[in-house]
Amino acid sequence: MPTSLKDTVKLHNGVEMPWFGLGVFKVENGNEATESVKAAIKNGYRSIDTAAIYKNEEGVGIGIKESGVAREELFITSKVWNEDQGYETTLAAFEKSLERLQLDYLDLYLIHWPGKDKYKDTWRALEKLYKDGKIRAIGVSNFQVHHLEELLKDAEIKPMVNQVEFHPRLTQKELRDYCKGQGIQLEAWSPLMQGQLLDNEVLTQIAEKHNKSVAQVILRWDLQHGVVTIPKSIKEHRIIENADIFDFELSQEDMDKIDALNKDERVGPNPDELLF
């Protein structure tokens, strides 16, 4: 169980990935992205998660550069967008992401959505980039069990990470169990369900008991389920608060109560319906 912001989980290829990071979905490019990245790194974060489609890789890259922390101490993730899927187009998209971020390599590169039929060619491109030493770990995002099963039929390298929507209303038990069995690390996007759970009565009671915020309880629940989590915030006080989750532990009863909130409810698209 992680006990500090710098604690890492070992991926199946031996690379260490921080349990906790900053997500920058819907963070504006330029100053907003730069300042939130700098604030996170200043306050001990070492993992930053962006994507081509977020259109803020430049701002993130400047934040990394201006943070004063050595590149090798950071864990930077980006993702290939749907329209760039395919072998050659993915290779080109990766180079563009690197250029925007002003980096020589990525720690993790993900296929953003499975879509219909291009993800195997896209995966071959990720395997090549990984073998060429341009990425330290490769993975997928929003893949359901059947997508992973299909991918693994032909994959030479198994994904190290699957980043999916995960929160108390979407606990993804089947997918969690499958990934655990395959040695694929699950990672949560939108862990706070875009703020929709902050007034939930069950969560409020648990938070009061531990003298924590609802957000802190949810993020702690992620970690106790063995799920890497990357909450988004642009406010420094919130960036600090989100990460203040290493000094308490949820009981099994707390965990069960939170698990029971599941309704298989999404704030993002259903991966089986987002076809391109």
Swiss-Prot record:
PROSITE patterns: ALDOKETO_REDUCTASE_1, ALDOKETO_REDUCTASE_2, ALDOKETO_REDUCTASE_3
Active site per database record: Y54 (proton donor)
Enzyme class, UniProt record, top EC level: oxidoreductase
SUPFAM superfamilies tied to this protein: NAD(P)-linked oxidoreductase
Entry keyword set: NADP, Oxidoreductase
Residues bound to substrate: H112
Transmembrane segments: none
Protein's UniProt keywords contain Transcription: no
Catalytic activity line of the entry: (S)-lactaldehyde + NADP(+) = methylglyoxal + NADPH + H(+)
UniProt GO molecular function: aldo-keto reductase (NADPH) activity; methylglyoxal reductase (NADPH) activity
Binding-site positions, NADP(+): 190-242
Keyword flag Metal-binding: no
EC identifiers of the protein: 1.1.1.-, 1.1.1.283
Disulphide-bridged cysteine pairs: none
Function: Reduces glyoxal and methylglyoxal (2-oxopropanal). Is not involved in the vitamin B6 biosynthesis.
Family: Belongs to the aldo/keto reductase family.
Name of this protein: Glyoxal reductase
The gene coding this protein: yvgN
